[in-house]
Each structure stands twice: as C-alpha cells, then as structure tokens.
Amino acid sequence: MYPLARRILFALDAEKAHHFTLDALNTVYKLGLIPVTDNRTKPIKLMGMDLPNPVGLAAGLDKNGEYIDALGALGFGFLEIGTVTRNPQPGNPQPRLFRVPEHQGIINRMGFNNHGIDAMIRNIEKSKYQGVLGINIGKNAVTPIQNAADDYLICLEKAYAHASYITVNISSPNTKNLRALQGGGELGALLEALKNKQAQLAAAHGKYIPLAVKIAPDLDEAQIEDIARVVKSVEMDGIIATNTTIDKSSLGSHPLAGEQGGLSGFPVREKSNRVLKKLAEHIDGALPIIGVGGIMEGGDAAEKIRLGTTAVQVYSGLIYKGPALVKECLKALAR
C-alpha cells in the first residue's frame, strides 16, 4: 500500500507532500481507520520513564504538535515533537526540503519553522495521547547566540508541565551559529542554566521532567569527548545522537549535493553510528543515549542498540518505507 502512495507523494513538492501526508493520516485516524495495535512489545526504562517499546518518532515530523494522536496510533514507544521556539517564526525561504531517492536521503534547511511554544501547548492540551511525549526546543533565528539561553529557558519553563521529557536542540545546521553551542564552555554554561531551571521547576510542579540534549554527527573525537564530559558533569538525563549532517560527500555528483542544509536518511547512517560508538565509550553508562540517524530498516535500529543506545528514533526512514518501518524495527529488536 505505502509503496504506491509513496510514488504519488514523491511526484509532489517535498514540503507539500509532507503536509498532505500528515493531514491524510489525521483524517484516517479521526475516522477510526487506523487499527489499534499493542505497542507494548519490548518495555524499557528511559530517563526514569516507562516506555512500551524503544522505537520513537524523532523531532521534525510534527513541529507544532498538531498530529500527536494520529502519530501515537502508529505503534511508537514515544513521540518527540518540535523543534519549537519561544516565538513563532516562518523558517527559511522555500524551497527548503529536498528528497534524494537515489541515496534514500533527505536534505532540509527548514530553519525551525513553527508556530511558537504557546501554540504547541494549546495543541498538546487538545490531544488525547497518553504516551511518552518529548518536546524539542530551540532558539529563534533573530535571537543573538549570546542570548540563546534566554530562549531555551523560556521554552523549558512553558513546556515543563506538558512534556514527559524535553530535548535541547543545539545541533541543527539551519540556524546560524547554533552548533557553536556544542563547544565545551558554551555547552556547559547553557546546560548548567537549564539544569538549574529544571530543579526550580521540579520543586514548583512536584514532578521531575528529564532533560536531554541533541548533538550533531559532524564532530571529531575530541569534541565528542568534550561533550560527554560536560553532559556527565552537569548530570543531564539523556543525550540524543545524532541530528543531520552538513557533509554531502556521500551524494557524489548528484545535482542536489550542493544544496545548503542538513542531510538525513541512509547517507548519515555511518557518520551517526561513528559518533554514537565513540559517545557510548566516553559516556560509559552515565546516562542513556537515544540513537537516531539513518534507520531505514529494522537491522539499522538493532545496530544502534548494539552500539550502546537505550532507545532509537526514526524519521527519514518513515518517508521512504512508511509506518511499516516501526513494526520492522520492533521485530528486529525482539530477536
């Protein structure tokens, strides 16, 4: 069924197809046509939370939390929505999303287009989803990098009562200078400020919401070691590895190889796994790792678990394989 739908969708502009697919999924869900599936196939603990299974949806698919219920019916163990920012912003000019089917890849330079944290919270409040929900937060493009912490702190405060966990996105290549926050000094200062705010919010709300950070695949070993040292030092609850890559050498002479933006899907798999392996060595079990990047089939999910992750997330693989990828990953992890 999905291969036929994909042929039609791939004939459309990538961003239009994205919205059309999600709207169609929402309609099918509201009509009660998505079969109810038992997603408690491999229960795990992650950052103190009970998950029915370790296969999650990565941030980026549902930026505003408009499709939570429909996505929650696809068998995921957890969902992550966003990236959301303090204020609404349009993102980068279109076209900004490109498929590279010859390489099973996607290039995006979306630029955190979203309706803002307040709109997202309204959508969450309307949702009936009872599962684990992560909120991925970023900074507005107009916010100077030296004031980035202000944006993250406001998003953290607003999201806190509505999230199962919160992810700090400092690794998108599509917001100017954002990746500079991955540097040791900058990273330590930002995460320490967020951990202090987390402690205040936990006391005020009477519940502890875990805090994770999402890193890039374009890191050398010294940078990976530095990040591992910082996240252990400030006692982050989790780390997500990895975001998209700016390295498009794997695309060779493909016409889209010169497009600006982050590359995801199959081409990022090996780079992501290299970072993941080194990160796991340096983290040494101090906090859980969520693996994302290049999961196109069940074996890719199993490989990330073998490299040291507690859970995995998918996104680009869904575009190429459809919802069947979730079951395929769960089957591979059950072996």
From Swiss-Prot:
Pathway listed: Pyrimidine metabolism; UMP biosynthesis via de novo pathway; orotate from (S)-dihydroorotate (quinone route): step 1/1
Protein location: Cell membrane
EC number, as in UniProt: 1.3.5.2
- Where does the UniProt annotation place the signal sequence? none
What topology does the record note for this protein and the membrane? Peripheral membrane protein
**What keyword terms does UniProt attach to this protein?**
Cell membrane, Flavoprotein, FMN, Membrane, Oxidoreductase, Pyrimidine biosynthesis
Where, by residue number, does FMN bind?
A: A59, G60, L61, D62, K63, T83, N136, N169, K214, T242, G265, G294, Y315, S316
Indicate what this protein is called per its UniProt record: Dihydroorotate dehydrogenase (quinone)
Species assigned in the record? Neisseria gonorrhoeae (strain ATCC 700825 / FA 1090)
Gene this chain is encoded by: pyrD
